[in-house]
């Protein structure tokens, strides 16, 4: 059995931050569950370009509001209780609105190792 708290993970190397977001990676590839689980905060009044060419992701909004814009497609509002699934390696822009950051629960397949950050194209590489 694996038991971890968000606070424990936040105060460790499992917390990764960039200019527009931070991710607390609670479950990683080396946990051997076949997926990874993160609590990600999208900072207020930001836009992040993301394109997971190597991963599928499902995201559940726990707090805050914003939107996701699929490149070449539609824009969808995000608020608490919204689940979106990037099942086609969808290139997208994730935006948190001015008044509050968004806190999201994220699941990745294949699982990430924990060291990944988005490259210049918004992609996470596949790491062993």
From Swiss-Prot:
Reactions catalysed according to its record: (2S)-4-acetamido-2-aminobutanoate = L-ectoine + H2O
Matching SUPFAM superfamilies: RmlC-like cupins
Residues in coiled coil: none
Entry EC no(s): 4.2.1.108
GO MF annotations, alphabetized: ectoine synthase activity
Root EC class: lyase
Keyword Isomerase: no
Keyword Lyase found: yes
Swiss-Prot/TrEMBL keywords: Lyase
Pathway: Amine and polyamine biosynthesis; ectoine biosynthesis; L-ectoine from L-aspartate 4-semialdehyde: step 3/3
InterPro entries (UniProt xref): Ectoine_synth, RmlC-like_jellyroll, RmlC_Cupin_sf
Pfam families according to UniProt: Ectoine_synth (PF06339)
GO biological process terms held by the UniProt record: ectoine biosynthetic process
Family: Belongs to the ectoine synthase family.
Role played: Catalyzes the circularization of gamma-N-acetyl-alpha,gamma-diaminobutyric acid (ADABA) to ectoine (1,4,5,6-tetrahydro-2-methyl-4-pyrimidine carboxylic acid), which is an excellent osmoprotectant.
Name of the protein: L-ectoine synthase
């Amino acid at each position: 059995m694996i038991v971890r708290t968000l606070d424990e993970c936040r105060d460790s190397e499992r917390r990764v931050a960039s200019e527009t977001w931070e991710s607390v990676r609670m479950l990683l590839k080396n946990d051997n569950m076949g997926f990874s689980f993160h609590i990600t905060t999208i900072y207020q009044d930001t836009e992040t370009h993301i394109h997971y060419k190597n991963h599928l992701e499902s995201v559940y909004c726990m707090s805050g509001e914003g939107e996701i814009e699929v490149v070449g497609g539609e824009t969808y509002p995000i608020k608490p209780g919204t689940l979106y699934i990037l099942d086609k390696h969808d290139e997208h822009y994730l935006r948190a609105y001015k008044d509050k950051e968004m806190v999201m629960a994220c699941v990745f397949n294949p699982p990430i190792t924990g060291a990944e950050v988005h490259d210049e194209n918004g992609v996470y590489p596949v790491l062993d």
